Amino acid sequence: MATVDLAAVDAHIDRNLDRYLAEVSDFCRIPSVGGDAKAMAAAEAWLVAWFGGLGCTAESLPAAEANPYLLAEIGAGARSVLFFNHYDVADYTNPAREVAGERHPFSGTIENGKLYGRGSADDKGTLLARMHAIEAILAATGGIPVQVRFLVEGKRGVSNRSLETFVAEHHARLDADCCLWEAGAKDERERQTISLGHKGILYVDLIARGTERTWPSRYTLFPNPAWTLIWAVNSLKGPDERVCVPGYYDAVRPVSEADESDVYAHLADDTEQLRVRAGLAGFVGGVTGRQALRQLYSQPSLTICGISAGASGPGQKLVLPQEARAKIEFRLVPDQDPAQVLAALRTHLDTGGFEAVEIEVQGSCPPYRIDAKGWLPRMLLETAARVYPNGAVLTPVATGIGNRYVFKEWTTMPIAGFAIGYAGYQIETNEEHIRVEDYREQVKWVATIIAALADR
C-alpha cells in the first residue's frame, strides 16, 4: 500500500507553482557569492527562516575556513535520505558581475517560461525544488514518512577541506539510506540525467624561477624561466594527446560490460550539438560520437588553465621574467588517486631535467562512483519514469568536480546526483536560467522519490 498520496501531492504542487517560483526568484536575488560575507549571511538567514517555517529543526553550524553549514531535519520513519546542496553561487569560472548589455546576474526575473539568475540552476533552484517537494508532501498528507536531512554548504570549491572536517565531526547525524547530490541536467533529448559519481582533480601551479627581480631583456646571459616552464609543460603531453606522466592511466577503471549495457547504451550522442555550440571544428584527438562519450566520461585529462610570465598588455616591454607560472589541472576518473598522480608528476619533472620547477598544490580530491546496478540508481530511474515524459538516463560520472568522496570514509550510503537544468541553461553565466516546467517536474520527482523510499 502506498504511503504517500502522490495525486494529492501533485495537485498541491500545481496549485502552488507560482508561489514556488516567486520564492526561487527571491532567493536568486541574494547575490551570495562566496566571498561576500553580507550576502552569504543573508542567504543563510533566508534558508534558516524557510526551514523553520516548514517545521524543520534547522541549525547553522560553523565551519573552519568556510561559511556556515546548514543542517535541517524533518520527518520520521524507517528510511532516511540526505539532500546535499549549496547556497553560494559559482564565481570562479565566470565572475558574477554586472556587464553592460547583459542581463543582471541576480535579476530573478521570469520571462517566456524561464526564470533567470545566477544560481537559478546551480544550485538554488535545485535546492528549493527539494524543499518544495517536502512542503508539498507535508501539506497534502500531513506528515513526512521518512527521515529527511538537508546539508547545505556555503563554500563550494575544487577541494573543500572544511567539508572533510565537518563530516568527520557530524557523520553520525548525516548518515542515511542514501544521499542525493546536486549534479545532472536534462540531455539533448530532454531526458533527465542521474550522475553515479564525480570526477576528481589534482590542481597545481608549476613554477619556474629566474633572477631575484625582473631585469631588462638585454641581459641575454641570464636564463629565462618562461622557457624553462614552457619546456616542462610541453613534456607533460604528447602530440597524440596522451599524458606522459608515468603510470597516469594505470589505475583508470575500464568500462565494464554492465556500464556498456546500463549506462553508455542509453546515453544521448549529443556530442555533435556540443561541438557546434562551442564553435569547434573537432574534438581533442578527433573523436566523434560514442567514442567521444567514452572519452568524456571514462578517460582522465590534463588541461593548461593558465600561463603567466613577465610582460603583458599592449606595447613593448623589454623584460626578462623573474618567474613563470602555469596552472595545470589533472581531471581524474575512478580509480585514480591524486596523491599518486602528484608523486608521478614530481618524478616525471625530475627525470626530465626539471628538478628546479616547483609544484604548488592548489587543490585535490579523488573521484567517486557507485554501481549502476545498485538499488539507488534503479529507484531513481523508476521514479523518474512517472514524472518525465522521456524518462531518465544514468551518466557514469558528472563531468564536474565534487566532494562525494568525503562521505565514503564515514558512511556506507550510496550517493547519486541530479539537478534542474537542460542543454541550453547557460550555467555560470549572467544568462543562467531554469525552465518553469522543468521546475514543476523536478518538485514532483523529488516527492515521488520520497514516496518510493518510504515504501522500500
Label every PLM stretch briefly:
Residues 2-120, 137-146, 328:
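Acidic/His- and Gly-rich active-site-bordering loop/insert found
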Residues 63-69, 159, 186-188, 398-403:
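Short acidic loop-to-helix transition motifs that present clustered carboxylates
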Residues 74, 208, 330-332:
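Hydrophobic beta-strand positions in extracellular immunoglobulin-like domains
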Residues 79-82, 114, 149, 177-179, ...:
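Structural motif
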Residues 88, 236-240, 346-355:
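A common structural junction motif
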Residues 115, 120-285, 291-300, 409, ...:
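Fold-level recognition of mixed alpha/beta catalytic cores in primary-metabolism enzymes, strongest
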Residues 188-189, 244-323, 331-344, 352, ...:
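An extended, acidic, His-containing surface patch that forms the Zn2+-binding/catalytic region
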Residues 202, 324-326:
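Hydrophobic core residues within well-ordered beta-strands of beta-rich domains
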